[in-house]
From Swiss-Prot:
Keyword Nuclease included in the entry's annotation: no
Subcellular location: Plastid, Chloroplast thylakoid membrane
GO BP field: photosynthesis
Membrane topology reported for the UniProt record: Multi-pass membrane protein
Family assignment from sequence similarity: Belongs to the Ycf4 family.
InterPro entries xrefs: PSI_Ycf4_assembly (IPR003359)
Residue stretches spanning the membrane: 21-43, 82-104
Protein name (database record): Photosystem I assembly protein Ycf4
Amino acid sequence: MTQNNILIRRYIIVGERRFSNYWWAIVIFLGSCGFLATGICSYLGIPNWLSLLNIGTTFSSETETLASGIVPFFPQGLLMSFYGSLGFLLSIYWSLLIFWNVGGGFNEFNKKEGFVRIFRWGYPGKNRKIDLSYSLKDIEAIRVELKQGLDAQRTIYLRLKGKREIPLTGIGQPLTLKEIEKQASELANFLQVSLEA
């Protein structure tokens, strides 16, 4: 997403607040609740609530169905509890990342005042706000890096004097080759610097 002006350009970086992260946090939470419920039910020696849903579909007696719905605690119930706890903790962690919006922020290129500002949200603590500011005079080039393979990476870098490179694209934010080329060329034209591959 871009907010354009003649003298100011701002590119919004989404960070952790993507639909896929919401989806996986919810799916992992629901799955872990099922695993935990099964583990707790097996520990207490009561039929699992999921097996009670099958009572009306089987032709055996109700006592056989209830007895077959009890999962032995060792090793199945113990493992189900372990995986459920792990999944629950993972979903809580993922939810906190979404809440904190880790990696979210913006890249601002301001010709009016002559600076580049790169802002990102990090993990809570002393360095929660990552706010970098550079003069436009320090920018040497815009560089595009394309890595092919199973985990293809397409990154736009801002190269400063002294060969320091700062990534401008967000992590986990896949852009098509056409989008990355367009964004990099627009940025190089706006800043009037060279574009390197």
